Amino acid sequence: MTYDSEFGSHISLYRDRIKQVIEDSLNEHPNSMILRVDLHDPIDTEEIDNPFFQPRVDSAAISRFTSALKAKLEHDKHIKTQRKDWPDTRHSTLRYAWVREYTKNGKRHYHLILCFNQDAYYHVGDYDLNRNTIRTMITTAWYSALGIPIDSSGKLVNYPPNGKYLLNRKRDNFEQTYSDLMNRVDYMTKVRTKIVGDGDRNFGCSR
């Protein structure tokens, strides 16, 4: 089934599944931080001369990304729980949804929402390879998934403007923030930038 918006036709199933991911996050983490993130493949793979660093742009890259990010979050939790002021209960279960899309030039990219416990992670932070900020962990997880060296720019990961949503059902602004988030979700569920029939999935989410 489909529905329509300013972006054209959309896939209803994708929207329903993404809503469930958000609900699951709120059920476990009443204070949830939801991020919109874009992951891009390298544009000019032929410029990477070292054969050991040829990008792994197969369909499993997105699964490697989520696995790498989970591992980084677990490692960050382990480090923080060594501190007396960081309770072990302040964990963050990663929940996510992604869609695969292609540009007019045939370049693959992914749009995602990533859900975190706001009590553990409130800020996205800077891209700093010396610190375990959310931005650093997300960006380096994608480079790891592609099997290429991490660079100082992190340019293959994009953080859209106003892409952070802080949700708590008890806050007065919950309905408006949730509505704004679902408008961003509509952009992810549009039909026109999806490729069907190539054997690879266009959608995936946490369970």
Where are these regions (language model features)?
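Short glycine-rich, low-complexity/disordered patches
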Residues: D38, H75-R95, I148-L166
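A Trp-anchored, charged/polar loop motif used as the substrate-binding/catalytic surface
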Residues: G8-E23, K70-T81, S92-A97
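Histidine-centered divalent-metal-coordination microenvironment in nucleic-acid enzymes
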Residues: R95-Y121
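Catalytic micro-motifs at enzyme active sites that drive phosphoryl/nucleotidyl and oxygen chemistry
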Residues: I22-L26, K84-P87, R95-K104
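Active-site-flanking beta-strand signature of metal-NTP-handling nucleotidyl enzymes
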Residues: S32-I48
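Intrinsically disordered, low-complexity Ser/Thr/Pro/Gly-rich regulatory segments
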Residues: T2, D44-E47, K107, M188
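Catalytic "initiation/cleavage/transfer" segments centered on a nucleophilic residue
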Residues: M1-H29, Q118-R207
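Short N-terminal edge-element motif at the start of the domain
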Residues: T45-T93
